[in-house]
Amino acid sequence: VELTGGEPLLQKELPELTRELLERGYEVGMETGGSLDVAPLDRRVTIILDLKCPGSGMQDRNLWANIERLKATDEIKFVLADRRDYEWAREVIARHGLLERCGVLLSPVHGELSPRSLAEWMLNDALAARLQMQIHKYIWPPGTRGV
């Protein structure tokens, strides 16, 4: 079961819900924008943490303490608008040892950064992160809901 959409951590019942799902034998993942504390969640929940880059205009909302709570089964995602975001993400990845801590995903902002450019930067730097595409944005027209 993956919990996403909006910000799941805004729901005060989330820790209880995830514990109940885990007790019933489900694997539980939760995608978060990274501005709220993940500490109340059971450690068995897989965290997908979206760390905001400078190009988002929301980097001041990052709760950096969340990085220290990430484990090998978790992932951290950087959505990159440009080369500046890429360089910022590389520095954060190195400073926090993220490649050794958890899965690292780099995703280009659709229509702003070409996937090819991002792939080339990653290859040139031998950056062992994964390139993630928001594939639905390439399949359906912009603004399509429910996909």
Predicted regions and their residues:
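Conserved AdoMet/S-adenosylmethionine-binding subsite of the radical SAM
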Residues: L9-V147
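Short Fe-S-cluster ligation motifs
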Residues: V1-G5
